[in-house]
Amino acid sequence: MLTYDNWEEPTITFPEDDPYKGALSVLKWAYGHYGDQLVYACSFGIEGIVLIDLIYKVKKDAEIVFLDTGLHFKETYETIERVKERYPGLNIILKKPDLTLEEQAEEHGDKLWEREPNQCCYLRKVVPLREALSGHPAWLSGLRRDQGPSRANTNFLNKDEKFKSVKVCPLIHWTWKDIWRYTSRNELDYNPLHDQGYPSIGCAPCTSPAFTAEDLRSGRWNGMAKTECGLHE
């Protein structure tokens, strides 16, 4: 089994010119290789909805983890409920941080995300994901290369130094148009905020509509020297 500890650059190749740009082949390999030990950490944005639909073709009881920071839009929680109805076999887990928002405010001050967004993301996303991935050799992510410079060199299979794991990214060759074309063709239900100028959706206090079509993540942490929540750095 390919793991972080015995990592070697994978020699396996996946087709990039098939209708799924390799995504379905990657998922079949990953679930065949890791089985129930493979976890998908999903934000339930549009890429997540597409990837869940593809996952369901391969493993109908897959484990999906949502990092429930307690700060998400109500539309995001409503989207999760609709996903549960459409894919009843999935094991969708809402992983909460150790600290409630009230406890975090007591320890670190009110609205930590406004003063120390990196610390807030660490407490409410990074630590919970580390706990969720404990004992799992690999996890799935919906990263795409065209999401921005920090993701441009992502491979199908990646040695993940942050979580000491193997990060599997089936959608790396999908474009924004590919995502929406698949969504339309398969009549997928998605977060309505995408239709209101939010191509990338995270916690409500730190997410605004995108300011430029060239940078789909330009609405995240607006006005701050921050582009990632810490999960993919």
Swiss-Prot record:
**Cellular component terms, GO, for this chain's entry?**
cytoplasm
Q: Where does [4Fe-4S] cluster bind?
A: 120-121, 203, 206
Molecular function, one GO term:
4 iron, 4 sulfur cluster binding
Query: One Pfam family this chain carries?
Result: PAPS_reduct
Catalytic residues (positions): 229 (nucleophile)
- Primary location group: cytoplasm
Swiss-Prot/TrEMBL cofactor(s)? [4Fe-4S] cluster
InterPro entries (UniProt xref): APS_reductase, PAPS/APS_Rdtase, PAPS_reduct_dom, Rossmann-like_a/b/a_fold
What is the catalytic activity of this protein?
[thioredoxin]-disulfide + sulfite + AMP + 2 H(+) = adenosine 5'-phosphosulfate + [thioredoxin]-dithiol
Keywords for this entry?
Cytoplasm, Iron, Iron-sulfur, Metal-binding, Oxidoreductase
Q: In which pathway does it act?
A: Sulfur metabolism; hydrogen sulfide biosynthesis; sulfite from sulfate
Lineage: superkingdom: Bacteria
Enzyme Commission code:
1.8.4.10
Cofactor binding description: Binds 1 [4Fe-4S] cluster per subunit.
UniProt keyword annotation of Metal-binding present = yes
Q: What induces it?
A: Up-regulated by sulfur starvation and repressed by cysteine. Also induced by O-acetyl-L-serine (OAS), a direct precursor of cysteine, maybe via inactivation of a putative transcriptional repressor of the cysH operon whose activity is controlled by the intracellular levels of OAS.
Q: Where in the cell is it found?
A: Cytoplasm
Give the UniProt record's GO annotations in the biological process aspect. cysteine biosynthetic process; hydrogen sulfide biosynthetic process; sulfate assimilation, phosphoadenylyl sulfate reduction by phosphoadenylyl-sulfate reductase (thioredoxin)
Q: Which family does it belong to?
A: Belongs to the PAPS reductase family. CysH subfamily.
Described function:
Catalyzes the formation of sulfite from adenosine 5'-phosphosulfate (APS) using thioredoxin as an electron donor.
Q: What NCBIfam families would the database entry show?
A: APS_reductase (TIGR02055), cysH (TIGR00434), PRK02090.1 (NF002537)
Q: What's the protein name?
A: Adenosine 5'-phosphosulfate reductase 1
According to the entry, what is the taxonomic lineage of the organism?
Bacteria, Bacillati, Bacillota, Bacilli, Bacillales
Q: Which gene is this protein's source?
A: cysH
